């Protein structure tokens, strides 16, 4: 991994695309992502397309993120503007480098004194449990939700699509711990990958909400980005082509509704909304 520290002039990015319907800003403590998921839409964004290094091989650590956040939110508050933050849209705030760098933790510490109105933390990492102490303080001063991506319950499937990301059992156990501490949680099945019939039961008791999203609905281009990333071929190679159906979300929702009330289950964009 090619890592380097960077000094950012801005850390709050005005929300665009599907985030704009509920959020005012996105916040990415890092640029790049060590998890290097094969289906990640960020691979097709300018931040990566103009890089000479492959996605997953480079990382920029925004070492002054907390300081810049404080300045920016103070300016927004002076203008009496709402602040609803999605963290993160183009990286994982709890990827391996965070364990030592502590950039996300420093941001949370700053947010306790300068809170947004709403914060959603989107991650694939069990490292989020390290910061439960801060999250408990933060939820007293702002609306907070921790959303854990659990795109399948099959470790063999995870190894195909995201071999460098944390294991599914580790993620599930971490979210259970966050939920047990009293923090609002969400299981995000995104992008939905082939899973076992027992998947709904395996996530029982670890979340307040479920968000289901697919490569077709969730890549921001109705499947075009996923196609460019070679997902149809990858699904076909491993015998998963039936799971690549553009209407697979309908079957998934109906199946999960056998285990959970429909009021708990959200689809794609609505599942990420505050």
Language model feature labels by segment:
Residues 136-140, 172-182, 254-261:
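Surface-exposed amphipathic alpha-helices with a cationic face
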Residues 90-92, 124-126, 149-153, 190-192, ...:
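Active-site beta-loop-alpha junctions enriched in small/polar residues
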Residues 164, 174-197, 242:
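Conserved strand-turn element in the central/C-terminal portion of the radical SAM core barrel
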